[in-house]
């Protein structure tokens, strides 16, 4: 899945969101910059999700798949930076950005704060696909390409505030 357009990156992202749908409280989110761009991903999900889970249901109004376990995968967009508040107060075990370089750093970093467990037993993580170019090219390159050669794990430390207010 190198950087080539049409290389299957978006398909892999749509399929990756299925990894934890056996967990009833699992919530996944797949993002594109605009809803029209998102429609191709929804079409891919129709092909893959129905085949893997014949009784899963897609709600076209709310753009969400509901699985037999109770798990849900949402499809969303963030055309403007201010749209990030549509995700305020929400938690997603998995967040997938399709075409990450179309997003501003502020949008990506805000969504990282939404990437948190919805209950016990889920793996919380984020994935992204991208091609060169776009408004976010500079920050994506600075964050993921410049720091180290390919294949090098990049660890980031952060301070976490506990419920009692301590860090």
Question: Which role does the model predict for each range below?
Answer:
Residues 1-167:
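Phosphate/NTP-binding elements of NTP-utilizing enzymes
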């Amino acid at each position: 899945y190198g950087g080539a357009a049409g290389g299957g990156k978006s398909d892999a992202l749509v399929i990756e969101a299925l990894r934890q749908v056996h967990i009833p409280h699992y919530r996944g989110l797949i993002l594109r910059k605009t809803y029209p761009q998102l429609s191709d991903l929804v079409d891919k999900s129709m092909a893959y999700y129905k085949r893997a889970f014949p009784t899963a249901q897609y709600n076209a109004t709310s753009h969400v798949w509901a699985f037999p376990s109770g798990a849900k995968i949402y499809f969303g967009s963030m055309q403007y930076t201010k749209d990030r508040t549509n995700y305020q107060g929400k938690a997603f075990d998995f967040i997938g950005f399709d075409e990450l370089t179309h997003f501003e750093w502020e949008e990506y970093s805000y969504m990282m704060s939404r990437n948190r467990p919805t209950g016990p037993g889920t793996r919380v993580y984020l994935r992204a696909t991208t091609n060169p170019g776009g408004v976010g090219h500079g920050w994506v390159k600075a964050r993921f390409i410049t720091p180290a050669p390919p294949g090098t794990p990049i660890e980031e430390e952060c301070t976490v505030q506990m419920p009692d207010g301590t860090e």
